[in-house]
Amino acid sequence: MIANAKTTEIESIEELSVYSLDHSHEGIELLINDSRKCGKDMRIDTRMALDTLLPLTNALHDFDSFEHSLCSLFEVDRKMICDNYGSLETAMDSFRTCMITVEQHLESKNIISLALLLLTKLPSTLERIQSLLPLLRHYIDEKYIQPETKHN
């Protein structure tokens, strides 16, 4: 059993996953803000911005791993986690494309394009994912937690 400061009892990986998704909004907001700040800094002081880019890309990689692990663990079909604007699969594909593009811009030293990506495309992609995470949470809750609650 895991307990947080509010003494919420978490007794299963499913509950821990839902708890994590409930608190992911703030983490994604930080990623969005850090991306925009890094993009702005890139236009002013490239060296300083590059120093903040590594922690940002590490955090983005961690988020990607978190999402991938959840979807693998709960056998989520990302195409089914969707709203009127598209699916989690499409949003995560866009996210991964952004990450590849960041690497390409760094390798080619295309700082202007990198700054633009960090200011616009990456934050909008993260916002899109952020809007879909409550649906992922609902899916896990409905499929894995609620049935367990009904049996107890």
Predicted regions and their residues:
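C-terminal-biased regions
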Residues: 1-152
